[in-house]
A protein has these predicted regions:
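An acidic intrinsically disordered interaction segment
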Residues: 1-25
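C-terminal binding/interaction regions
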Residues: 4-12, 58-83
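Amphipathic, hydrophobic secondary-structure cores in small proteins
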Residues: 17-55
């Protein structure tokens, strides 16, 4: 089963629309930034926070970019993901 098929099935199970290609891309960027700026666990939890906040993936990505510009997305001295 492809990721697209799995996501479509899970979306149906949850009673929501299947994410668009753009939404998936925005979530992957967000997850990647979270995992590389912190620990891997931050990736799925960051995506959960987007949903919890009721934001679109695009809006969350925009806010993340603003946060990064202010220098807050990576703690000083952090070099990347930790396991």
């Amino acid at each position: 089963m492809s990721a697209k098929e799995w996501l479509a099935g899970f979306a149906t199970l949850l009673g929501v629309e299947t994410p668009t290609a753009e939404e998936i891309r925005d979530l992957l960027v967000l997850a990647g930034d979270a995992a590389h700026a912190s620990e891997r666990i931050a990736a799925p939890v960051a995506c959960w926070l987007v949903a919890r906040a009721g934001l679109s993936p695009g809006e969350a990505r925009k806010r993340l970019e603003e946060w990064k510009e202010k220098g807050f997305a990576r703690q000083e001295g952090e070099g990347g993901s930790k396991d």
